[in-house]
Amino acid sequence: EAGLPKHDSLSNMILQYGKYGKNHVYSHRKGKGMPSYDKLAENLQVGDLLVAKKRARHIMMFIGTLRDFGYTEEELPELAPYLDYALVIHCGPNFAYTDRIQAFLDAHQDDSYYKGVKTTDGGVAISIIGVPFGDAPNRGSYGVNDFAWFDMPDGYKLTIWDLPSATSFCWFRMNP
């Protein structure tokens, strides 16, 4: 809340459209449709929240675009058509964490501090919104989740968050 008046729960602000509709930038609701993915980020503000539902509700935060972070067509030829697509930060299942954390635990198996520590099935990740799954050069599954991703120059795996597969969604702005 950062010094602002206390606000309602995020769940209520998303679900109570009659009360909080002014905060809904775009959604699955009629009349609140989004622009095309290549124009979406132009109409968002860093900090806008994306709440989407597939099997359960998932909350993500808009952080900008690849171009905002200084990437170019030359640097990312596979992602060149998507440099202006929205990037979100979120936490949840992510295949990339399991092996990395297990490797760390294996390398420190003699350290009693890590005795009994199990690997995780996810963590904080950056994903891109709107890129068709089929356009990603890499695909995989972990548990019930399917992933498609691009390998970034620094080794990071930039996953696609597949918004078209959501049954409902809302881009939400705290202070419209």
Which residues make up each language-model segment?
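Low-complexity, Gly/Ser/Thr/Pro-rich intrinsically disordered linker/tail segments
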Residues: 81-85, 89-176
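...with weaker cross-activation on analogous glycine-rich loops/strands in unrelated enzymes
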Residues: 4-111
